[in-house]
Regions:
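S-adenosylmethionine
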Residues: 1-431
Length: 431
């Protein structure tokens, strides 16, 4: 266990110093090349779990220490161990013993004794500490909801009826949802295939299948052959809301990693241009399309400045955002984001919207999409755009009865729940 704790502590420490977990975790794993697959898997679980509940775990650690430690790695090791003692099924004695061993490997002479003392104090005083945290107005909400205070305050203001449920969803494990390629099968048939292979799943309409337990894509029947793709249920709305028709010219303006790109091509025979400003990420789009045996014109470019001689009938603008609606998938986001980042994203989004509008044909439709739950990036952004473009009209989102039943949507905002992430959709038509 101590190897997994050590790897997780390296990853958590790097995230708390500003690194993205998608970069920090592989780097931490690479520092222990002899770790077994089980140790590597456990390290990933501990990294995600510690950051998912960092607000709570850190509140306990602050109460246990007289002052913050100067050693970031030992701090992170304590955070990982306290997370285990609070949320993991591992035996308390084993967690403490292995954390002390990990501290010894980390080399500071004082580390073993301090880690041992802090963790044993935690076990003795856990109930008292919980009451102290609950009574401390400076940290009680951050500890209870494991989100930054500014984030909690914003959700209280913008979602007075839903803020607690949104925060709870943000701390939950995300579902694994598949999109069935309608050219090859449908959700009901595919669920029957899964049942024959003892994989429990639920179909959420014609295309979406939610697995009871996540599995590796290598174990997903038909994935390699393009029968299914991994895509959140809420994200599957994008291609459907575009109102696609045969032979249309389509621009997917922020295409990587290509989930929505592939979905568009599954639904209609169209001429699609996939644009992204990152060439390496565009390679992922190419890989996705190859698996689906679909073709698009892939272009590297910035959606805020991109020019094209073509006027497009449909444009998908899945713009950069705070990603506040997908924090359960990216647990580091809530601790890396700052409230000031919202305004920076809004400037970028406005520039993209304004530029793409020039590429849209008359009577064409542009679907504006974010994976954010902050209104500044969503309807407020659209309202500002509409004030400046009198040839733009926001259309109602037309959902099928099946989608209406399963999707929790409020004025274009998908409120994150156990079935789907938090996304925003606005469909704009050019007159």
């Amino acid at each position: 266990m101590y190897i997994s704790q050590q790897i997780a502590a390296i990853a958590v420490s790097n995230v708390l110093s500003g690194r993205n977990l998608t970069l920090a975790l592989p780097e931490a794993l690479n520092s222990y090349p002899k770790a077994t697959p089980q140790q590597r898997g456990a390290a990933a679980d501990l990294s995600y779990g510690t950051l998912r509940f960092y607000g709570e775990v850190n509140a306990y650690l602050e109460k246990l220490l007289e002052k913050p430690l100067s050693n970031a790695h030992i701090t992170a090791l304590l955070l990982v161990a306290i997370y285990q003692l609070l949320h993991d099924k591992a035996d308390d004695f084993t967690v403490v013993n292995q954390a002390v061993k990990a501290a010894g490997d980390a080399k500071p002479r004082w580390a073993k004794g301090l880690v041992n003392g802090v963790l044993r104090n935690f076990l003795r005083q856990k109930d008292v500490l919980a009451e102290q945290i609950k009574a401390d107005p400076k940290i009680n909400e951050v500890a209870l909801y494991s989100h930054p205070q500014w984030w909690i305050n914003k959700l209280k203001n913008q979602y007075p009826q839903h803020w607690q449920a949104i925060l709870a969803t943000g701390n939950a494990h995300p579902p694994m949802t598949l999109r069935v390629n309608v050219q090859q099968s449908n959700a009901q048939e595919y669920c029957q295939l899964l049942a024959r292979q003892d994989i429990e799943a639920t179909h959420l309409g014609d295309q979406a299948v939610m697995l009871a337990k996540p599995i590796s894509v290598e174990q997903v029947p038909g994935f390699a052959d393009g029968v299914v793709s991994v895509q959140d249920y809420g994200a599957q709305l994008a291609a459907q809301l575009l109102d696609l028709q045969e032979n249309m010219r389509i621009l997917d303006a922020c295409a990587a990693p290509g989930g929505k790109t592939g979905h568009i091509l599954e639904l209609a025979d169209v001429a699609l241009t996939a644009l992204d400003n990152d060439a390496s990420r565009l390679n992922r789009v190419a890989s996705n399309l190859a698996r689906l045996q679909k073709v698009a014109d892939l272009k590297v470019g910035d959606a805020a400045t991109y020019k094209d001689n073509t006027q497009f009938d449909r444009i998908l603008a899945d713009v950069p955002c705070t990603a506040s609606g997908i924090v359960r998938r990216h647990v580091d986001i809530k601790w890396l984001r700052r409230e000031a980042d919202i305004a920076k994203f809004c400037v970028q989004q406005a520039a993209i919207l304004s530029n793409l509008w020039q590429l849209l044909a008359k009577d064409g439709k542009l679907l504006y999409v974010t994976c954010s739950i902050f209104n500044e990036e969503n309807q407020q952004q659209v309202d500002q755009f509409l004030l400046k473009h009198n040839d733009a009209t926001q259309l109602p989102l037309l959902l099928t009865n099946e989608l209406e039943k399963n999707i929790q949507i409020q004025h274009g905002q998908l409120i994150p729940n156990h079935q789907h992430d938090g996304l925003f959709y606005a469909l704009l038509q050019k007159s």
